[in-house]
């Protein structure tokens, strides 16, 4: 099964010849190498680029071990450049080369060379590769498969069934290829323990790995919940686990984020137009990895749907925060009181902004009021949207608030502008 990944291919195409090193980043096993060496390579060939003008180097291949030497690699590349036509250089797992920054910097000085690299492992995660090229690197971040990408490749399968699979096993390309649910689950659990967490432990010399594992379980169990290191430290104590300081927890959370396992969403005071430093929320980059950490015992569709909406927004290149709105209400004694209510997502991209609520169902008037109350009290005219699980016809209420179904939101790239 081939996933076309057209969004990322189009990104690579639009960034061609920009005199920068294109750095393809993302969680391990998200398909970075396939994107570059198969899909983008095919695009170049289909558009008339000769094979001998595409230089590919997979540094994780034992046969290419000599090319891990920077001078040998540079000489190899220069030896393949025979004319003044454009050459495309693609290097996979660039961190395996010593002094690779110098090599790529040398390539930047050659006018007819366009360079693309990937890099990720325990000693040099892809977030670090991008850091090395601040000012000279052009990041193209690859996420796990989106729901629409999966549906495109499996158009003969019922959408609701695919949603159940996606919600449970996520969107890592290899996971989709397995036929049985047991194979998917076993793969994810093994990948989490033997690749992602092992990378973090080796990279940061973590000896007491049980605490790291336990922290990830707590974060996985509480996706979409407001938290901070001190709260998580208290959770360790209350659950009878060993004491873990807030500072250590903060470090571990940073490690998870650096490895692209989780994303942190800051709180934003909508009326005050300022960020609130704590608490904040975490969402898993891949739902399958989240569920694997909990041994597939905590499949809560409400929270997983919220996480899926967050991931979709991030994939569409939006900046996503958690919103807070202060409102004045009357209490049971008719006294005026201030309350803070939450907007699930404050979504920004350039001059665009959207406010989005994830609501599994609007099953009663009270539930509808609960979801609309924060949106009604936002003092601006940016679009306000509620996403529900049911596949409904899009509708607008008297306040201009749009309610749409999850399927429409996930499947239509322009759903926020309908």
Regions flagged by a language model, labelled:
Residues 56-84:
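Short glycine-rich substrate-engagement loop in P-loop NTPases that contacts/grips substrate
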Residues 45-61:
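Conserved catalytic segments around the Walker B and adjacent sensor/switch elements
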Residues 2, 34, 41, 49, ...:
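A cross-kingdom feature that marks ATP-driven nucleic-acid transaction machinery
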Residues 114-120, 141:
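Structural recognition of the conserved hydrophobic beta-strand(s) that form the central parallel beta-sheet
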Residues 2, 143-144, 148-326:
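Interdomain hinge/linker elements that couple catalytic modules in large macromolecular machines
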Residues 2-17:
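Pre-Walker A adenine-sensing motif
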Residues 123-139, 154-155:
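Short regulatory helix/loop adjacent to the ATP-binding pocket of P-loop NTPases
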Residues 24:
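Hydrophobic anchor at the beta1->P-loop junction of P-loop NTPases
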């Amino acid at each position: 099964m081939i996933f076309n990944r057209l969004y990322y291919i189009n990104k690579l195409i639009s960034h061609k010849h920009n005199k920068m090193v294109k750095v393809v980043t993302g969680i391990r096993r998200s398909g970075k190498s396939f994107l570059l060496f198969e899909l983008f390579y095919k695009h170049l060939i289909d558009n008339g680029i000769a094979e001998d003008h595409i230089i590919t180097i997979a540094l994780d291949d034992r046969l290419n071990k000599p090319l891990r030497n920077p001078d040998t690699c540079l000489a190899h590349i220069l030896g393949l450049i025979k004319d003044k036509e454009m050459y495309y250089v693609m290097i996979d797992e660039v961190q395996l080369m010593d002094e690779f920054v110098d090599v790529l910097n040398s390539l930047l000085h050659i006018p007819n060379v366009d360079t693309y690299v990937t890099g990720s492992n325990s000693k040099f995660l892809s977030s670090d590769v991008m850091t090395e090229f601040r000012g000279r690197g052009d990041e193209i971040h690859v996420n796990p498969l989106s729901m629409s990408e999966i549906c495109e490749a499996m158009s003969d399968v019922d959408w609701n069934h695919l949603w159940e699979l996606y919600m449970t096993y996520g969107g890592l390309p290899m996971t989709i290829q397995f036929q049985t649910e047991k194979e998917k689950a076993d793969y994810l659990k093994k990948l989490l323990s033997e690749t992602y967490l092992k990378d973090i432990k080796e990279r940061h010399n973590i000896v007491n790995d049980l605490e790291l594992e336990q922290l990830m379980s707590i974060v996985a169990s509480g996706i979409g919940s407001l938290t901070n290191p001190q709260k998580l430290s208290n959770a360790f104590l209350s659950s009878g686990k060993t004491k873990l300081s807030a500072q250590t927890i903060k470090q571990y959370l940073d490690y998870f984020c650096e490895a692209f396992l989780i994303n942190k969403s800051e709180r934003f005071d909508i009326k005050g137009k300022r960020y609130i430093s704590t608490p904040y929320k975490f969402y898993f980059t891949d739902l399958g990895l989240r569920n694997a950490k909990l041994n597939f015992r905590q499949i809560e569709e409400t929270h997983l749907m919220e996480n899926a909406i967050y991931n979709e927004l991030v994939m569409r290149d939006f900046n996503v925060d958690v919103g807070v709105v202060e409102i004045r209400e009357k209490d049971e004694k008719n006294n005026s009181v201030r309350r803070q209510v939450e907007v699930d997502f404050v979504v920004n991209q350039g001059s665009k902004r959207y406010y989005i609520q994830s609501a599994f169902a609007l099953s009663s008037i009270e539930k509808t009021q609960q979801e609309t109350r924060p949106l009604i009290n936002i003092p601006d005219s940016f679009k306000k949207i509620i996403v529900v699980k049911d596949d409904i016809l899009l509708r607008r209420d008297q306040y201009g608030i749009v309610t749409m179904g999850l399927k429409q939101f996930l499947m239509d790239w322009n759903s926020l502008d309908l």
